[in-house]
Amino acid sequence: VFVLNKSKVRNVRLKTNKADTGGKLEIFILNIISDYECECLLNFSGKKVKGTEITTDIVNFKILDKDIDTFIISTDIKIESLIEKYGITPLPPYIDDDPSKYNYYKADFSSGGFSVAASTAGLHFNKEMISKLEVENKIIKYINLDVGIGTFKPIESRFIEDHKVHNENYSINKNDFKEILKLKKEGYKIYAVGTTVLRTLETVIKTNIFKGTTDLYIKPGYQYELVDYLITNFHAPNSSLLSIVLSIYGEGWKELYMYAQSKNLKFLSFGDAVLFKIT
């Protein structure tokens, strides 16, 4: 049984210029709060304090609130309209912002949801491959987990146990989940295509809640209850994603990653994948 995350990467990066100075300004939308309000990252020179009003070439906005590194802003244009008209694909910062790469950062089976980053293991699958798996009597199921920016936030605490993972919205069809449980009892192996799928399935098996938010942080010592195999890319150091690898593979991950490097395998979002056996 292969389970994939169908949440679609939205065009949440807005690049524009200040109307008064012409200075570059970027809005990275993280979450839509209402038609005219969103949570976002802001990148421009100048003050970024509560009450600041900015006029740009595409939208006027006001900073309503500020957290450590995120902002709540109100706009004079609907957020969805901004995304549809001006948004571009939010490639990771270590990938050159080349429009020719945008389609490669979106799985062609994705639909619905609101992800601001890709579930990169799913990028190894396309509709043709999924059809071939189904012809071979493999069972395909889908979850939705809206990938947030927190998924890739580095672990900055001294001990990985002290790290906190941001809440992310997830959902799975109740009947699909029951079928997955039934198939597992019948001896089928459950393959999670990506850490987002792994975290969703493990959240649901523990809570029996089919739609909600999860901040499940998987680290060494975690007891897996449902998933048998994980397909995932090679991850950056000091990340909660690598903590998942550590929980499955142990300290041997370093030798594994060094071996991958020696074979010129590619890391991170557009990189190669590895299959881990969990149970």
Report the location of each language-model feature.
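Surface-exposed, charge/polar-rich loops and edge strands
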Residues: 1-279
